[in-house]
Design a protein with these regions (language model features):
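Post-HExxH zinc-binding segment in Zn-dependent metallohydrolases
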Residues: 4-53
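Non-Sec secretion/translocation targeting segments of pathogen effectors
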Residues: 21, 213, 224, 228-251
Length: 251
């Protein structure tokens, strides 16, 4: 059913399937995006009440892999999205993301059960339940961030290796930059910022190589006159660095 894979003993992909269904429902109903915070993670979503964390990650995948193919596979129960995901990253990444979304879903269900149990428990028992709930919340936060980082690095590392034209360079830059609008962030989260700066440096070098006909030995970066595109890349990197510095100073 949907994006789920069934074995004799377990259903895989339930978290991704639930998130995709909710994203479709929110889009049909016309729910507007809202900034929310769950378990220390801040992000923008059009599903603030139902599976918000799962929807945030699924929305990242929809942006990178394609919203149409995600919804089509959900409705028709086929592997088109799965195959495109694997082609854009790897089978290992797909399985890790699928498993992580399931883990988040089940951990949230455990929190609901524990909250219900707490209403019928003694004070000492409640203290133990509260500790368990906090552990689950922290586990969810860490799983979310690890999964988000994996999605970023796996997709954009693969895409970088496929760049073969100057047009590809610009498309890559724009797609990585716009990913910021899909991020879930916590206090002190820097992975995306650090990755972006690193990739912009590599992209600058890649651009120079392609502009010189693919001949890396012909480059003389120090003496090369910067063009408008290279200047743009450097300005974007400086903006990220300046923003990070200001945040540190404000603390």
């Amino acid at each position: 059913m949907g994006l789920c894979d069934h074995s004799d003993f377990k259903v895989y992909g339930l978290g991704l399937n639930e998130a995709s269904v909710q994203l479709m429902a929110s889009k049909v109903i016309g729910i507007k995006n809202d900034f929310v915070k769950y378990f220390g993670i801040s992000f923008e979503t059009n599903s603030p009440s139902y599976y918000p964390l799962e929807c945030c990650l699924a929305n990242q995948l929809a942006y990178l892999i394609g919203e149409d193919i995600l919804f089509e596979s959900t409705i028709n129960s086929n592997d088109n999205f799965k195959n495109k995901f694997i082609e854009s990253t790897s089978i290992k990444t797909f399985l890790c993301v699928q498993s992580a979304l399931d883990s988040i879903l089940y951990a949230e269900e455990d929190i609901i059960k524990l909250n219900n149990k707490m209403m019928e428990s003694t004070k000492d028992r409640c203290d133990n339940i509260i500790r368990k709930i906090e552990e689950l919340k922290n586990e969810i936060m860490l799983t979310f961030l690890r999964t988000q980082n994996l999605i970023i690095s796996s997709y954009f590392n693969t895409a970088f290796n496929k760049i073969s034209t100057l047009e590809d360079v610009e498309k890559y830059r724009r797609k990585l930059y716009n990913f910021k609008d899909y991020l879930g962030s916590t206090d002190g989260y820097t992975f995306y910022h650090d990755y972006y700066v690193e990739q912009m440096a590599k992209l600058e070098h890649k651009y120079n190589i392609l502009e010189n006909g693919g001949n890396e030995t012909a480059l003389d970066v120090k003496n090369k006159k910067e063009n408008l595109f290279i200047s743009l890349l450097k300005k974007i990197k400086d903006l990220f660095i300046k923003k990070d510095t200001n945040m540190q100073e404000s603390k």
